[in-house]
Design a protein with these regions (language model features):
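Beta-rich interaction/scaffold domains
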Residues: 21-152
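C-terminal motif of bacterial Sec signal peptides marking the signal peptidase cleavage site
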Residues: 16-20
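Positively charged n-region of N-terminal signal peptides that target proteins for export
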Residues: 1-7, 23
């Protein structure tokens, strides 16, 4: 009798342990938590002033990689800024930048001429000659935070 009871107990334990896998929990809760977690610049056009071999002043443009330039993200004040100004001759009107958000939130940028928002695309150049406002929305679409970005 003991020999028949052990396989029966193993089968019952197997059925009970596999029964917990039958629940199909398809409800997914999106997070309301949102923040900008990273901000980096790309290549910027910079004008360099130099003298030619004849002693005449001349200028030339060069695309310089500023991805290593440090930016601070103040989560309390919702501000993003660089502690050191960009070098002389950098054109801040056409800047490529990359923005990372918490929980893959949606990042939008406010228009300079109206109150409309558009989806931020890191392949489009952005005018940072004036402070810009970025909005990051949570995955649930309920919560958002507004950040002011200053590039000096």
């Amino acid at each position: 009798m003991k020999i028949k009871l052990i396989p029966l107990m193993v089968v019952v334990c197997g059925i009970l342990s596999l029964a917990s896998c039958l629940n199909d929990d398809s409800d997914f809760v999106y997070s309301d938590d949102t923040a900008i977690t990273s901000f980096t610049l790309g290549k910027l056009n910079q004008v360099f002033h130099t003298k030619s071999s004849q002693g005449k002043d001349s200028t030339y443009r060069k695309s310089v990689d500023y991805s290593g330039h440090k930016f601070y993200i103040d989560q309390v004040k919702c501000e993003i800024y660089n502690p050191d100004s960009l070098p002389l001759g950098v054109n801040a009107k056409k800047v490529l930048c990359s923005i990372g958000s918490k929980n893959a939130g949606y990042v939008g940028i406010k228009s300079m001429t109206s109150d409309s928002l558009k989806y931020f695309n890191s392949t489009d150049s952005t005018d940072f000659s004036v402070p810009r406002e970025f909005y990051v929305y949570s995955n649930s679409g309920v919560a958002y935070r507004k950040y002011t970005v200053r590039v000096n």
